């Protein structure tokens, strides 16, 4: 699975676009992963969004992940779920999920990352690397040094998140991130597709340079 550009949808931070609209525009900008994240909407709306986004992602060959809601992820036949430290236990999610189902886990410390790997996570969402206003529950800033340490200590993919944008993306990649998860750097922009495409070009250029 390719994690290079991992776009998290957020209607509250968009310019009036719905989750499916954000996803379609990010997909057009060459996003590799789309995560549906909404802590406030009702379950019916979330499921409708998930079904529509899963279809669009499948057509484009893009991985589709649902944040937190394993029930919605399973009902919509998403590729996986992403859970935080205060969400359901990873071991429970793994027991319930079908074979091949992707489970990502948020981590903000080396210990949390190691535990997630031990418990069977497929990847780690590590951060916030930089200060961010996109997530009220983001936790304390981790920084690039801690990102390097986590990348050194775990063998599963590490996707960096938190305050990442086009300006600082190269240094996050240089710290060892396998992918960049972004919210406002894409979904809050006037042209979502162009913002995604620009970030993907930065990542691709970095990869092609042979620095990673």
Swiss-Prot record:
GO terms for molecular function: magnesium ion binding; thiamine-phosphate diphosphorylase activity. Pathway: Cofactor biosynthesis; thiamine diphosphate biosynthesis; thiamine phosphate from 4-amino-2-methyl-5-diphosphomethylpyrimidine and 4-methyl-5-(2-phosphoethyl)-thiazole: step 1/1. The keyword Cell cycle does not apply. Mg(2+) binds at residues 68, 87. It holds the Pfam family TMP-TENI. Its EC number is 2.5.1.3. Condenses 4-methyl-5-(beta-hydroxyethyl)thiazole monophosphate (THZ-P) and 2-methyl-4-amino-5-hydroxymethyl pyrimidine pyrophosphate (HMP-PP) to form thiamine monophosphate (TMP). PANTHER family: THIAMINE-PHOSPHATE PYROPHOSPHORYLASE, THIAMINE-PHOSPHATE SYNTHASE. Belongs to the thiamine-phosphate synthase family. This is Thiamine-phosphate synthase. It comes from Methanocella arvoryzae (strain DSM 22066 / NBRC 105507 / MRE50).
């Amino acid at each position: 699975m390719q994690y290079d550009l991992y776009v998290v949808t957020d209607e509250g931070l968009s310019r009036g676009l719905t989750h499916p609209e954000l996803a379609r525009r990010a997909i057009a900008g060459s996003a590799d992963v789309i995560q549906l994240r909404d802590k406030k909407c009702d379950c019916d709306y979330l499921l409708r969004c998930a079904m529509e986004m899963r279809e669009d992602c499948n057509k484009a060959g893009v991985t589709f992940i649902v944040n937190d809601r394993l029930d919605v992820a399973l009902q919509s036949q998403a590729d996986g779920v992403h859970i935080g430290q205060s969400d359901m236990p990873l071991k429970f999610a793994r027991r319930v999920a079908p074979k091949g189902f992707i489970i990502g886990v948020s981590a903000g410390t080396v210990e949390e990352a190691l535990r997630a790997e031990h418990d069977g996570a497929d990847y780690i969402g590590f951060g916030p690397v930089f200060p961010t206003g996109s997530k009220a529950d983001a936790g304390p800033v981790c920084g690039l040094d801690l990102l390097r340490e986590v990348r050194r200590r775990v063998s599963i993919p590490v996707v960096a998140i938190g305050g990442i944008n086009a300006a600082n993306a190269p240094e996050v990649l240089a710290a060892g991130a396998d992918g960049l998860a972004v919210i406002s750097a894409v979904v809050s922009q006037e042209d979502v597709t162009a913002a995604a495409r620009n970030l993907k070009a930065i990542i691709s250029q970095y990869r092609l340079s042979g620095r990673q």
